[in-house]
């Protein structure tokens, strides 16, 4: 079966699988081969960003959604004039909208630069310092853990086993007296 050529329904020629059920290197049918070839790596630097849904992972669902009703509320019986309430709503909403845009225009790029540098340093330290230190610690602690385990099995296990045997014959009988 190996080495033969097959023609699929579209008339395309492809090589036969190594064995009937296929393997990870050479799948047994064309659809599996197509699935394996479809997997592409996407570069994070060239992917397109969504300009409509700017919070696809919902990071700010609970914290930043502040509307007029979340900040200013008049209880029953204490209401201002309707025109004042509408003007206050419009003023709050427009001010928040444009001031956020102004702050984003002034500080958005510098803050993105600062946070990019910060997370680059954090990633660098995690990859090149933290994980190697933890791995080194785990390797070095194995020696101590073996010695500790031997000491526990030598001294503590017999002691606690003896204490367990002593108290294994203790019987308690409870009676309710009325």
Swiss-Prot record:
Interaction with CAVIN3: annotated segments: 82-94
Main location: Golgi
GO MF terms, alphabetically ordered: molecular adaptor activity; oxysterol binding; protein kinase binding; transmembrane transporter binding
Region annotated Interacts with SPRY1, SPRY2, and SPRY4, chain positions: 149-160
Span list, region Interacts with SPRY1, SPRY2, SPRY3 and SPRY4: 131-142, 167-178
Compartment(s) where it occurs, according to its Swiss-Prot or TrEMBL record: Golgi apparatus membrane; Cell membrane; Membrane, Caveola; Membrane raft
Pfam families reported for this sequence: Caveolin
Cross-link for Glycyl lysine isopeptide (Lys-Gly) (interchain with G-Cter in ubiquitin), residue positions: 5, 26, 30, 39, 47, 57
Segments for region (Required for homooligomerization): 2-94
Cytoplasmic side: 2-104, 126-178
GO biological process terms on file: caveola assembly; cell differentiation; negative regulation of endothelial cell proliferation; receptor internalization; regulation of cytosolic calcium ion concentration; T cell costimulation
Positions where N6-acetyllysine occurs in the chain: 5
GO CC terms: caveola; endosome; focal adhesion; Golgi membrane; membrane raft; perinuclear region of cytoplasm; sarcolemma
UniProt KW keywords: Acetylation, Cell membrane, Golgi apparatus, Isopeptide bond, Lipoprotein, Membrane, Palmitate, Phosphoprotein, Ubl conjugation
Residues modified as N-acetylserine: 2
Intramembrane residue numbers: 105-125
PANTHER family assigned: CAVEOLIN (PTHR10844), CAVEOLIN-1 (PTHR10844:SF18)
Annotated family: Belongs to the caveolin family.
Quaternary organization: Homooligomer. Interacts with GLIPR2. Interacts with NOSTRIN. Interacts with SNAP25 and STX1A. Interacts (via the N-terminus) with DPP4; the interaction is direct. Interacts with CTNNB1, CDH1 and JUP. Interacts with PACSIN2; this interaction induces membrane tubulation. Interacts with SLC7A9. Interacts with BMX and BTK. Interacts with TGFBR1. Interacts with CAVIN3 (via leucine-zipper domain) in a cholesterol-sensitive manner. Interacts with CAVIN1. Interacts with EHD2 in a cholesterol-dependent manner.
Designated name of the protein: Caveolin-1
Organism from which the protein derives: Didelphis virginiana (North American opossum)
């Amino acid at each position: 079966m190996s080495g033969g050529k097959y023609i699929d329904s579209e008339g395309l020629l492809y090589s036969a699988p190594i064995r009937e059920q296929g393997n990870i290197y050479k799948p047994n049918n064309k659809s599996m081969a197509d699935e394996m070839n479809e997997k592409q790596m996407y570069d994070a630097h060239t992917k397109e960003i969504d300009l409509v849904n700017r919070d696809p992972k919902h990071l700010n669902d609970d914290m930043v959604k502040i509307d007029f009703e979340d900040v200013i509320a008049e209880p029953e019986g204490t209401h201002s004039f309707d025109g004042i309430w509408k003007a206050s709503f419009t003023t709050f909403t427009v001010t928040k909208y444009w001031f956020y845009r102004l702050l984003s225009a002034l500080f958005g790029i510098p803050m993105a630069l600062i946070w990019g540098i910060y997370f680059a340093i954090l990633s660098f330290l995690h990859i090149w310092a933290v994980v190697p230190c933890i791995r080194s610690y785990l390797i070095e602690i194995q020696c101590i853990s073996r010695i500790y385990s031997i000491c526990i099995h030598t001294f503590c296990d017999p002691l606690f086993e003896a204490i367990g045997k002593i108290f294994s014959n203790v019987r308690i009988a409870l009676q309710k007296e009325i």
